[in-house]
Structures are given as structure tokens and as C-alpha cells.
């Protein structure tokens, strides 16, 4: 089984982990109801996508 020859320093460990962070999701505004929604997805509040009513959208009453 392979074993590390040298101890990995804190600096090298942290440099390796520099790209492991999470990015916040980008949000766009729904043109119908002006609520925030994720791009390229149907609006969760009004159920429209590209100006059309999406079948099977859960309406909040």
C-alpha cells in the first residue's frame, strides 16, 4: 500500500483545498410575478416558463 514520503504541510493542504468552496446559485427575476427564480427553470410561485403556463406546476393558493 502506498504511503506518503513527506508530511503534507498546512500551507500545501490549504492550497489544495482552495477550490473546494461552494458557489451561491445565481438568481434571475420572473417577468410575470417579479419573484426571484433560478435561470432556465419554471417560476416556483407562478408556474410560468418563457411566458407560458407550465402543466403540472404546483399552484400556491
From Swiss-Prot:
Region (Disordered): 1-20
Recorded GO CC terms: large ribosomal subunit
Claim: Ribonucleoprotein is one of the keywords in the record: yes
Pfam family, one: Ribosomal_L32p
A single MF term (Gene Ontology): structural constituent of ribosome
Basic residues: bias regions: 1-16
Ribosomal protein as UniProt keyword: yes
Keywords: Ribonucleoprotein, Ribosomal protein
GO biological process, one term: translation
Record InterPro entries: Ribosomal_bL32 (IPR002677), Ribosomal_bL32_bact (IPR044957), Ribosomal_zn-bd (IPR011332)
Family to which the UniProt record says this protein belongs: Belongs to the bacterial ribosomal protein bL32 family.
Entry-linked NCBIfam families: rpmF_bact
Name of this protein: Large ribosomal subunit protein bL32
Organism in which the protein naturally occurs: Trichlorobacter lovleyi (strain ATCC BAA-1151 / DSM 17278 / SZ) (Geobacter lovleyi)
Amino acid at each position: 500500500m502506498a504511503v506518503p514520503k513527506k508530511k503534507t504541510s498546512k500551507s500545501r493542504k490549504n492550497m489544495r483545498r482552495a477550490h473546494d468552496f461552494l458557489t451561491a446559485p445565481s438568481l434571475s427575476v420572473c417577468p410575470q410575478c417579479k419573484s426571484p427564480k433560478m435561470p432556465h427553470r419554471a417560476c416556483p410561485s407562478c408556474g410560468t416558463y418563457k411566458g407560458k403556463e407550465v402543466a403540472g406546476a404546483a399552484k400556491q393558493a
